[in-house]
């Protein structure tokens, strides 16, 4: 019985590691010199001259960090599903927000009531880097600018 459990755990570990290998590890350096780690899932088969959607997957606060892996925890396997990859071919960007930052604000609001939201503030440095990264991918000829999700 212990051997069966051990083999099962080894199999699950292998699946998880192989998922991380399919997503290319990348680091984007912004015009301000900030770095933004991200993963890129490319198409299995890309047809010359065809445009494909771009999916930008922003994780929650629990996946922030610097390992360039935690952002794959929720959603990473879904995009690798062979049925999804064949039926919905797309480039998938999965950036990782640094542990000391948030995607939207430089400081987290006390509540999310509209009147408490910071209006007129500059976007956070990490979001600025994300915008630049997105612009790079939108300039690529194989990306359909009308299908960014």
Features from the language model and the residues they span:
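Alpha/beta-hydrolase
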Residues: 56-58
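Short, well-ordered amphipathic alpha-helices
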Residues: 39-42, 72-80, 130-138
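A domain-start/cap signature at the N-terminus of enzymes
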Residues: 17-54, 90, 126-129
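Gly/Ser-rich "nucleophile elbow"/oxyanion-hole loop immediately N-terminal to the catalytic nucleophile
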Residues: 45-50, 104-149
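Sec-dependent N-terminal signal peptides
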Residues: 4-15
